[in-house]
A protein has these predicted regions:
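Trp/Gly-enriched beta-strand/coil motifs that build multi-repeat beta-propeller-like domains
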Residues: 1-148
């Protein structure tokens, strides 16, 4: 049995949170857009993906994004709201916990994972990676994308 996963984010860029769910059974995001009070269905992802929405392109609208675990790695799939282009980034291991957020303060969501007390961040501002030891191996990481 598949369980829908919910997310709150500003997909339409009106400054208000939109209600959304990701339905793994059909790989579709369902969004109630607050600006126009309209419904949007966006196929993007598949069963087993972890949802990681954020403003990866810095346009003020949340982008559809998922973290997919392969046998060895973690792959990030992002659909940019600015131009509907699609990108993939291999970042992390298949056992990592995805923790996107604006860690470098540039207004764009950075790709990041948490692994046993260490944060691994791929900065959107310069493409550089940073690591931060913070937390214990069994801690649950808390990070939120900076959606403007």
């Amino acid at each position: 049995m598949s369980v829908n996963r919910s997310s709150t984010a500003d997909f339409d860029g009106d400054g208000r949170t939109d209600i959304s769910v990701f339905r793994p059974s059909d790989g579709t995001w369902y969004v109630m857009q607050s600006g126009s009070n309209t419904f949007r269905a966006q196929p993007f992802g598949q069963n087993g993906d972890k949802i990681v929405p954020g403003d990866y392109d810095g346009d003020g609208r949340t982008d559809f994004a998922v973290f997919r675990q392969t046998p060895q790695n973690g792959i990030w799939y992002v659909m940019r709201s600015s131009d509907n282009s699609f990108s993939t980034v291999q970042w992390g291991l298949n056992t990592d916990k995805p923790t996107p957020g604006d860690f470098d303060g540039d207004g764009k969501t950075d790709i990041a994972v948490y692994r046993g007390g260490t944060w691994y961040v791929l900065q959107s501002s310069n493409g550089q990676s940073t690591t931060h030891q913070f937390g214990a191996p069994d801690d649950i990481p808390v990070a939120a994308a900076n959606v403007q």
